[in-house]
Amino acid sequence: MFSCKQHLSLGACVFCLGLLASTPFIWCFVFANLLSLEIFSPWQTHVYRLGFPTACLMAVLWTLVPAKHAVRAVTPAIMLNIASALIFFSLRVYSTSTWVSAPCLFLANLPLLCLWPRLAIEIVYICPAIHQRFFELGLLLACTIFALSVVSRALEVSAVFMSPFFIFLALGSGSLAGARRNQIYTSGLERRRSIFCARGDHSVASLKETLHKCPWDLLAISALTVLVVCVMIVLHVHAEVFFGLSRYLPLFLCGAMASGGLYLGHSSIIACVMATLCTLSSVVVYFLHETLGPLGKTVLFISIFVYYFSGVAALSAAMRYKLKKFVNGPLVHLRVVYMCCFVFTFCEYLLVTFIKS
C-alpha cells in the first residue's frame, strides 16, 4: 500500500506533466491565431496552420527514439524552448516586422516541444488510472486557458498573457524527475520487468505482438476515424460547418483527443454506441442545418467529435489494458491517438484551405 502523501505527490506531478504535454499544441495555436492573416502573409499562414498536424507527426516520431536518448535531450530542449518563447515574447513587444523571423522561430522550436508528450505519456500511463485522469485534466485545462485567451482577445492585447506557457514548461519539466522517483511509478515499472528471454530490462511489445493482441481495437479506431472524416467532408461542403470554427477547432481536436473522453463499460459496446450517435448527429446537421441555425449546427457538429473521442478513449483504454505487461504500451497509445489527431487536423486544414463550401 502507498501513503496518501505519495498519491498526492504523484497526482501533482502528472497534472504538471499534462500542462507540459500541451505545449506543442499551444505553440501552434498562438502562432496560428496571432500571426496568421491570409491577405498579408499567405505563406506564413500555411506554415502556422500546418503546425498542428506536424506537431502530431513529430510527437509520434519521437516515440521511435530510444528512451535513454530522449531523456538526455530534456535539458537542452527545455533551455531552447524557453529561449525561443522569450525571443517570441520580445518580438511581440518590441518588433513591428516579424514576417520572416517568426516562422523561423516557430519551426525551430516545434520539434523540441514535441518531445514532451512522449516523455509525459511514457510515465503517466504506467501509473494507476486515477493519476492518468489528473494528466488528462492538466492537458485539457492548459488548452482551455489559451483558447479562452484568444476568444477574449487577451493575447492580442498584451504578450504578457504568454506567461502561462513559461509556467507550463517550468512546472512540467521539473515534475519529470519527481514522477520518476515516486514509488507508485517505480512499482508499475517493476511489473513490466522482462523475464527469461525478453531483451532489455523490461518487456517490450513488438509491432507483430501489438497487432496480435489488439487487432479489433485498431480496426475499430480506424473505422471510427474514417467515418468522422467522411462526415467532416460532407458537412463542410453542404452545411458550412467550419464557418467561425477554423481558429479554434485544431486545438480542440488535439486537446480533447489527447485528453480522452468518458468511457464506462465494454469498449466495443461504447464504440458502437458512439459511432451510432456520430451518424445520427451528422444526419441531423445535414438535413436540418438551416433550421438549426449557426449555434445549433455548431453544437451538434462539435458533439460528433465528442462522441468520437469517447469511443476512441474506450478502445485505447482497452488496448492499454491488453499491453499492460509491456513498458512501451503507453507509447503504442500515443502513436494511435496522435495519428488520429494528425488525420483530423490535416483534413481540417485541407478542407478549410482548398475546398470551399
UniProtKB/Swiss-Prot annotation:
InterPro entries: Herpes_BMRF2
Record topological domains on the Virion surface side: 1-11, 68-70, 122-133, 180-217, 262-267, 320-335
GO cellular-component term (any): membrane
Bilayer topology annotation: Multi-pass membrane protein
Keywords assigned by UniProt, alphabetized: Glycoprotein, Host cell membrane, Host membrane, Host-virus interaction, Membrane, Transmembrane, Viral attachment to host cell, Virion, Virus entry into host cell
Record's keyword annotation contains Membrane: yes
Domain of life assignment: Viruses
Intravirion topological domain: 33-46, 92-98, 155-158, 239-240, 289-298, 357
GO biological process: symbiont entry into host cell; virion attachment to host cell
Keyword match Transmembrane: yes
TM segment ranges: 12-32, 47-67, 71-91, 99-121, 134-154, 159-179, 218-238, 241-261, 268-288, 299-319, 336-356
Family of this protein: Belongs to the herpesviridae BMRF2 family.
Domain notes: The RGD motif presumably is the main binding site to host beta1 integrins.
Function of the protein: Facilitates virus attachment to oral epithelial cells by binding to host beta1 integrin family. Participates in rearrangement of cellular actin to increase intercellular contacts by binding BDLF2 and thereby promote virus cell-to-cell spreading.
Protein name: Protein BMRF2
